[in-house]
C-alpha cells in the first residue's frame, strides 16, 4: 500500500519487523555514546519536565544551604525521558561524585553491601531499574537509606552473626519505568519523587535545535517540527531520528535539514507522520485487513504479524493505545476509527456497527 505524507509510505511489512527500531525508547550502544555528548550539565540547560525541574531545584538548593546531602530521589517514567540525565545533574548540582549501577546487577545483598561500603560521603548512587533489584538487597536498602547503616551477616546457620556497618551519608537516586512494582516501604523512604511526562512537540523542537547545534548540523524550524512530530514524545527517539536525518542530508542534500529533507529521510527509515514504524503498522494492518478491526485475541494477532505475543503486547501496543489507535477490551484488541483513518482504509459496515458501543457512532 502506498501512502502520502500523512500516512504509510512503504509497502506493508511481512515477517518479523522488530530488529533495529528507530522508535524504540530503550538506549542502544550508539545512543549511550552520543547521549554523553548531548547531555545537559545542569537544571537550567535541561529542557522540559518543568514541574520536576522546579521542585528538584528547591530540594537541591535547600540541601546545599544546609550543607547536607540531598534527600533520596525517585524518578519514574517511560524510557528515554531523561532519568539518567537528571541523576547526573543532581550530582553536578551537589558537587558530588556519582556511582551508576542497575537493579538487575544487584542480585544478592552482598552485592549491594559492597557498593554501599565503598561510597564517599555525599556521593550520589544512581540505581537504574530499581524495581528489578532482588528482595534481599531491597530489604538491606531500607536500613541504608534511613539510618545510613547495614547489617552484614557473617557465617551461616545458628552461628551467623550480624555485624553493623556504618555508611557515610549519601543520596540514592532510583529510576524506574514501573513505579507500581516498588514495595511501599521502599517508596516511602524517598524524600522526593518525580514523575517524568512525555514531551510536547514544542519541547522536542527545543531539544532538537540544541542537539543539532552540538552536532554541528543545520536545521530549520520546519525540519525540527517534522522530526519532533514523529518522536513519540521522547527526547532519546528525537535525537536518534535527528542523527539518521543528518546522515540523509549529508548524502542526499547539502547537509541542512528542512521539512522536505526530514520527510524524505524518515520515509526511507519507515517512520510515518505519527511516529509509527513497520512493527506498529504491521499490527494495525493485520487488525484492520485480516480481522475487520477486531475484536481479536492477542495470540492470534501476534501470529498474523509473525511476532511473539510479548513483542506485540509490550513493544507495539503501548504506543498504539496511547495514540488512540488501538483499544484493549475484554473481548480482544479493537481498532479505533483513528486507526482506519491513519491507514487510509474504510471500516466494513459490520465493524463500524460492532464498535459503536466502544467508540460511538
Curated annotation (Swiss-Prot):
As for what it does, the entry says: The RuvA-RuvB-RuvC complex processes Holliday junction (HJ) DNA during genetic recombination and DNA repair, while the RuvA-RuvB complex plays an important role in the rescue of blocked DNA replication forks via replication fork reversal (RFR). RuvA specifically binds to HJ cruciform DNA, conferring on it an open structure. The RuvB hexamer acts as an ATP-dependent pump, pulling dsDNA into and through the RuvAB complex. RuvB forms 2 homohexamers on either side of HJ DNA bound by 1 or 2 RuvA tetramers; 4 subunits per hexamer contact DNA at a time.
- By what name is this protein known? Holliday junction branch migration complex subunit RuvB
Traced from the root, the source organism's taxonomic lineage reads: Bacteria, Bacillati, Actinomycetota, Actinomycetes, Kitasatosporales
Q: What is its EC number?
A: 3.6.4.-
GO BP field: DNA recombination; DNA repair
The gene name reads ruvB
Listed Pfam families: AAA_lid_4, RuvB_C, RuvB_N
CDD domains, alphabetized:
AAA (cd00009)
What terms describe the molecular function in GO for this protein? ATP binding; ATP hydrolysis activity; four-way junction DNA binding; four-way junction helicase activity
* Chain positions recorded as DNA binding sites: 309, 328, 333
Cross-referenced PANTHER family:
HOLLIDAY JUNCTION BRANCH MIGRATION COMPLEX SUBUNIT RUVB (PTHR42848:SF1), PTHR42848
Q: What class of enzyme is it?
A: hydrolase
Q: Which Gene3D superfamilies match?
A: 1.10.8.60, P-loop containing nucleotide triphosphate hydrolases, Winged helix-like DNA-binding domain superfamily/Winged helix DNA-binding domain
Q: How does it assemble?
A: Homohexamer. Forms an RuvA(8)-RuvB(12)-Holliday junction (HJ) complex. HJ DNA is sandwiched between 2 RuvA tetramers; dsDNA enters through RuvA and exits via RuvB. An RuvB hexamer assembles on each DNA strand where it exits the tetramer. Each RuvB hexamer is contacted by two RuvA subunits (via domain III) on 2 adjacent RuvB subunits; this complex drives branch migration. In the full resolvosome a probable DNA-RuvA(4)-RuvB(12)-RuvC(2) complex forms which resolves the HJ.
Quick one: where's region Small ATPAse domain (RuvB-S)? Answer: 200-270
